[in-house]
Amino acid sequence: PTPLDDLKAALRFLTREKPNLLKMVLLASALNFVVLGYGAVGYAFVIRTQWGFDATVYGIADGLISVATLMGMLIVTMMAGRLKIGHMTKILTLLGLTVIPQGVACMLSGGNWTRLMALVAFACIGDVICSCANIIAVPAIQMRTPDAMLGKVMALLSALAMCMQPLGQMAYGWAFDHLPAAAIFIASGAVLIAMALLSASLFAHFDD
């Protein structure tokens, strides 16, 4: 079978036998669209273009966020046994609540350095929380997928994630060119909170 056949088989399996897994795969793809969109495009645009910091400052800020991501993964790995699918609603809500202050940071009147420190601080916290979501969502899909379909389902998840990344970057690139950065971050946080609330029943009845 070709890779396309595998993706079709995975989609048929999820649609007919595991609709909740399909919803989780789609939710993960939507999260990639939003998080990679504001993260990959927004930080560079705001720090370099709007606030006028040089490459060194941006590199340090990006490095701090990356370190926070790694630390988050280590911390979350140690807590993996305590993290359950039922925690996803709270985790996604908290993630949204770290993005909204990033929009508020863009409106602070204390100067660009104050804005930068606030943005990076909440971005670091958000990345740690995002690590929690990843450590729950991916194993949740893997553990509930039969061995015979596991490779196909994970390939579908990877394909959707790869598609969402450039689409998110293009959409957010357009948005940051035409809309205030503060509004984009605040709207993104609100979208994440809405996704959490709309998915609450999915997480509560995931194995039904």
For each predicted feature, which ranges?
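Juxtamembrane intracellular "pre-TM" segments in multi-pass secondary transporters
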Residues: 1-26
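Residues at helix-coil transition
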Residues: 15-16, 35, 48
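Generic structural signal for secondary-structure transition and capping sites
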Residues: 19-20, 38, 84
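Transmembrane helical elements of multi-pass membrane transporters/channels
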Residues: 23-27, 41, 69
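Alpha-helical segments in transporter systems
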Residues: 23-34, 157
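Conserved extracellular-gate-facing transmembrane-helix segments in secondary transporters
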Residues: 30-40, 130, 165
